[in-house]
Amino acid sequence: MTAPADVVFLLDCDNTLLDNDLVQDDLREHLAREFGPASRDRYWAIFDQLRGELGYADYLGALQRYRLGDLSDTRLLLMSSFLVDYPFASRLYPGALDVIRHLRTWGLTVILSDGDVVFQPRKIQRSGLWEAVEGRVLIYVHKEQMLDAVAALYPARHYVLIDDKLRILTMIKNVWRDRVTTVFPRQGHYALDPHNLTAYPAADLTVERIGDLTACGLPALMGATAARAPGR
């Protein structure tokens, strides 16, 4: 049995380490340019519908469902290449890799993401994040429901969870309580949505950019949990 580490850092991918909003903007522009605005809008309608059904973003699955509406359009065969070959490394937030190196001086760094089993791993690999965390990558449909599995794979006395979604931070905090420090980088459309900011309690620590964490020492991260304890 693996002895628990003192601390393990669990980092989300999309809009935490990688600007996924910008990836989506590029995809929208590509669809409009290659297929026209109507086809672009149809793809995103299918994408949103599928995300509601599956609980995660499935870009390739949406493309497959889109294709069923027009099997004669051979241009769609090249559409998957745009997604699979996209230069994800250029969409990392400034300082993202530096943060991983910084945190690694105190404990294991693990990517903890939601997504499909094809496109999401590809994104993490091509962005350089897979290598940065030495292959410690977990991808689930609903990661907040997989905490026992996470703890079994990477046992630790304390976890630091870094995620752009206050909903996720809150749900995991409610389960792990003082065993986890929640860190909220205010990046991406979820993090900046006024409804989300009022619907959920604040994280233990909030930073404006992921790169700001390079200035945080381990005592500051661990102390953020203790500082909020009396108010919970």
Where are these regions (language model features)?
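A metal-dependent, Asp-based hydrolase signature
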Residues: 23, 34-40, 47-84, 102
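Short hydrophobic segments within beta-strands
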Residues: 12-13, 112, 162, 185
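Short, surface-exposed alpha-helical segments at coil->helix boundaries
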Residues: 25, 29, 57-60, 117, ...
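Substrate-recognition/cap helix-loop segment adjacent to the acidic, metal-dependent catalytic center
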Residues: 97-110, 114-138
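Short, acidic loop-to-helix structural element flanking the phosphoryl-transfer center
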Residues: 60-61, 81-111, 144, 148
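Asp-based, Mg2+/Mn2+-dependent phosphohydrolase catalytic module
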Residues: 1-4, 125-161, 165-232
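Active-site neighborhood of HAD-like aspartate-dependent phosphohydrolases
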Residues: 1-45, 68
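Conserved Rossmann-like nucleotide-cofactor binding loop
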Residues: 16, 23, 117-118, 167, ...
